[in-house]
């Protein structure tokens, strides 16, 4: 029997995430909305391209706020049948209330009443400091949900690194399975790790300094790491099927930064084969103008999103000189 699940991800990546969900075995997508997807699955999902995943206990029509959602739960007991009772005995839980992607406070009198009902019917007990289970009352424009959160947030990120769920989407867009892939200007581990997990046959990381090269050498095995300029590498002409470039969005915009990106784009044209794919992740302020002016690359798709509070995008491009319209994501 397929259970109903709800997963969140970075808003702006709806199309690639939906395509990735549809490629998962045993998954039936019901709805994809900004920053989230509702789907059924025969097994508990563990997908690297989403941020948080929940089991859906109850769906409600849109409400004005979390207090209205909690009151509606109190007046309807149908959701009690959805609890996984084999997992509830002795578990500690807390209730989390949220509007969209922001946590908000609810009327504690209503929350206490909801906690009491759950304790009486499931064998769980409240423990707000260090719970085993989080039950979310989530209000969104399309619906209100009562959710059982599964596992922990999968999208870890260290300072200066991309979130792991974004990196997994980039790996999918690069179509790197069983292919030669190069990361130009590689300064973090999360991106090459996602490309390697995506099935890259041979992965080359060109790092701007020794510290970045040493970091990647210590974290990833089976990856060729070299130090040098992104605009001048020893990678053979036409030997790569994908090239990925990430410009840290909080870096200061300088003439040198623009020059480095321009040189890296020219280098990508040299090392990519005729069907190669070029992916750039950067803030609009850093890259939009340079990408628009660069000759010899053709835009396949652009996904606008927010990274580290900055308006950014993922550009998917090709060096293939053709006017024939291509489908980025094969259905």
Task: List each model region and its residues.
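Class I S-adenosyl-L-methionine-dependent methyltransferase catalytic core
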Residues: 1-25, 31-44, 105, 130-132, ...
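Active-site phosphate-binding and catalytic loops of NTP-dependent enzymes
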Residues: 120-133
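Non-catalytic nucleic-acid substrate-recognition regions in nucleic-acid-modifying enzymes
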Residues: 1-121
């Amino acid at each position: 029997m397929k259970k109903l699940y709800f997963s969140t991800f970075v808003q702006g990546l709806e199309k690639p995430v939906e395509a990735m969900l549809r490629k998962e075995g045993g998954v039936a997508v019901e709805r994809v909305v900004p920053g989230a997807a509702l789907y059924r699955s025969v097994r508990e999902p563990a997908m690297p391209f989403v941020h948080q995943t929940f089991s859906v206990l109850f769906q409600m029509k849109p409400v004005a706020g979390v207090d209205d959602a909690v009151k509606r739960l109190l007046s309807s007991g149908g959701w009690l049948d959805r609890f996984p009772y084999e997992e509830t005995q002795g578990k500690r839980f807390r209730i989390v209330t949220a509007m969209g992607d922001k946590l908000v406070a609810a009327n504690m009198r209503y929350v206490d009443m909801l906690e009491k009902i759950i304790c009486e019917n499931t064998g769980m007990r409240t423990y707000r400091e260090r719970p085993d289970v989080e039950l979310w009352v989530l209000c969104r424009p399309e619906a209100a949900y009562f959710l059982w959160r599964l596992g922990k947030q999968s999208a870890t990120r260290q300072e200066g690194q991309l979130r792991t769920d974004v990196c997994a989407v980039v790996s999918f867009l690069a179509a790197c399975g069983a292919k030669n892939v190069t990361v130009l200007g590689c300064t973090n581990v999360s991106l090459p790790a996602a490309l390697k997990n995506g099935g890259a046959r041979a992965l080359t990381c060109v790092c701007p300094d020794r510290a970045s090269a040493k970091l990647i050498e210590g974290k990833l095995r089976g990856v060729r790491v070299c130090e040098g300029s992104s605009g001048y590498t020893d990678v053979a002409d036409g030997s790569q099927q994908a090239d990925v470039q990430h410009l840290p969005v909080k870096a200061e915009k300088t003439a040198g930064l623009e020059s480095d990106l321009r040189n890296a784009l020219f280098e990508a044209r040299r090392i990519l084969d005729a069907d190669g794919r070029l992916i750039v992740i950067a803030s609009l302020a850093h890259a939009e103008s340079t990408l628009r002016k660069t000759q010899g690359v053709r835009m396949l798709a652009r996904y606008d999103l927010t990274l580290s509070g900055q308006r950014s995008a993922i550009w998917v491009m090709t060096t293939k000189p053709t006017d024939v319209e291509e489908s980025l994501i094969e259905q």
